[in-house]
Amino acid sequence: MKNITELLELLRSDLNQYNSLVEEDILKLLQNKGAYFLFEYDYEWLEISAWAMNKEGDYISQRIDIPSKKKEKYFPSDIFMDKDIHLEDELYDHGVEEDEIDDYLDEYAQKKEDIISKWFQQRWKNALKNAHIQADGYFSPHDSYFYTDLNTGKQINEDQIKEKHSQG
């Protein structure tokens, strides 16, 4: 659907405006010298929270918000957030059948999550490469048991993360 495609393109464009700022924020977090780093984003508001963790799986840093500075009131942009919040209403207004709306919204949510995850993974890789650092980081929606390993792109769960780092 055209509305969803345009909205996803807006998301990509808006996220890319934050590339250097987010990479700087990642480097600041890496100064905590954790065994690994967790990044979680709020699915509705896209705010990213980050922590340094020790090998026992305990937090060793204060929560850091990424991006640390916003260009507008909302991240990634006020326009995107407004359109994102009103997408369901817009589908109804365009006469989309109710049973199709759920399918559209599910497809949109999956694509949005994929875009955010791949974008953040690239920010992570760029930050590490530019600083000549090796570190482990994991990214997920807030309060999820499953994370994306930012170095490999593969899914890993909380228990596997803790087990991996408690052995090192």
Question: What do these predicted regions represent?
Answer:
Residues 1-13, 30, 108-168:
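Acidic, proline/glycine-rich low-complexity IDRs
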Residues 2-6, 15, 96, 100, ...:
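Alpha-helical context
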Residues 14-33:
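Short linear interaction motifs
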Residues 18, 36, 41-43, 59, ...:
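Sequence-level detector for tyrosine residue identity
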Residues 44, 58, 82, 86-88, ...:
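A generic signature of intrinsically disordered, low-complexity regions enriched in glycine/proline
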Residues 62-66, 76-77, 163-165:
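Glycine-rich loops and low-complexity Gly/Arg-rich segments
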